[in-house]
């Protein structure tokens, strides 16, 4: 399968650089998710890899072969779009067969591929049904099956589960996770949904304003965001930011009203703009203990899937904490917090992690 290498890739529309000088490698047989808000350039980047857009400058390589201006049909890739491409008035089996018939494969090979893909996607029982009988989630599985059955080197997914209902979305996400674990193709998946990215990716390329701000495995990019943007965009809720008005700095030591210990910034020259801490990293106690901070006021408690999301207030400082059980504390009463130094991330004046 192909390794994909992008070198100084730029796509301009007038004065706007939708993709701005990206150099980036996608390992072969990996699942790479291009994640970011609407308008960040992720779909434009995918379309250039597919050959549907021509770069303004820069190069694209599949392994060591440059394909920057090679037509899409010669790139040996499959695509699954937001709106499934299916043939109405035909059966599921026929929809899966058609791309293979154009390649003039033997009928035995076509039947084998169709049956294998249907089993992989859990739609074997639907093969003889007309596509009009199926829900949107199953129709999107057909679109996935059509791309997989061709056995291309690369498969591109452009927000494939955005326009289906929540139940079908969860089922399709589970199916895609299973499919991806069993495929050897290089997969590129575009989404604005962080939950999809965290569930499906081997690596996430987080995009903003046409550039990749961080590329790392999901766990790393969540626990060690390299920017305030990454900390805010990944997580529900996003990371708590304590801005400089709540931070004290003396030499390399950093203190805050959120915690008792002093954190080392590493250099006196570094000016700390903000610090970040995840909601689940804040331990909340109903009684004060020696290592806990001055009392916060509990303002809200919301049960979510067996956990509780708390809104805490310390003067003008407001943070969210996630705890595994109900506190048994009335709203408006005091609670105390503890945070490990290793869970605190410092950000400089440019919003970059120190």
Model-predicted segments: where are they?
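The feature captures the beta-strand-to-loop junction immediately N-terminal to the Walker
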Residues: 35-37
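Helix-to-loop junction immediately C-terminal to a conserved catalytic motif
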Residues: 50
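Conserved ABC transporter NBD signature motif
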Residues: 58-66
């Amino acid at each position: 399968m192909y390794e994909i290498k992008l070198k100084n890739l730029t796509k301009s529309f007038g004065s706007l650089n939708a993709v701005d000088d990206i150099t980036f490698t996608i390992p072969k047989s990996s699942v790479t998710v291009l994640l970011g808000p609407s308008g960040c350039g992720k779909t434009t980047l995918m379309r250039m890899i597919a050959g549907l857009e021509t770069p303004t400058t820069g190069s694209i390589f599949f392994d060591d072969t440059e394909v920057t201006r090679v037509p899409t049909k010669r790139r040996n890739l499959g695509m699954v779009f937001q709106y499934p491409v299916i043939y109405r008035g035909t059966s599921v089996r026929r929809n899966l067969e058609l791309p293979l018939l154009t390649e003039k494969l033997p009928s035995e090979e076509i039947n084998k591929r169709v049956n294998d893909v249907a089993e992989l996607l859990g739609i074997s029982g639907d093969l003889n049904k007309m596509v009009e009988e199926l829900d949107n989630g199953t129709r999107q599985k057909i679109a996935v099956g059509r791309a997989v059955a061709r056995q291309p080197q690369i498969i591109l997914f452009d927000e494939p589960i955005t326009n289906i209902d929540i139940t079908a979305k969860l089922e399709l996400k589970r199916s895609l996770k299973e499919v991806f674990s069993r495929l050897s193709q290089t997969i590129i998946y575009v989404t604005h949904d962080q939950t999809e990215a965290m569930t499906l990716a081997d690596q996430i390329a987080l995009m903003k304003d046409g550039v990749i701000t961080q590329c790392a495995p999901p766990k790393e990019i969540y626990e060690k965001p390299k920017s305030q943007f990454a900390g805010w965009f990944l997580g529900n809720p996003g990371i708590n930011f304590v801005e400089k008005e709540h931070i004290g700095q003396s030499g390399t030591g950093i203190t805050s009203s959120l915690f008792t210990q002093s954190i080392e910034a590493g250099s006196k020259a570094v000016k700390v703009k903000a610090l970040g801490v995840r909601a689940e990293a804040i331990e909340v106690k109903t009684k004060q203990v020696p290592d806990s901070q001055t009392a916060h006021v509990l303002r809200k408690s919301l049960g979510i899937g067996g956990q509780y999301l708390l809104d805490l207030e310390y003067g003008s400082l407001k943070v969210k904490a996630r705890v595994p059980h109900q506190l048994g504390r009335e709203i408006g009463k005091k609670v105390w917090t503890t945070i490990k130094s290793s869970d605190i991330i410092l950000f400089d004046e440019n919003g970059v992690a120190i």
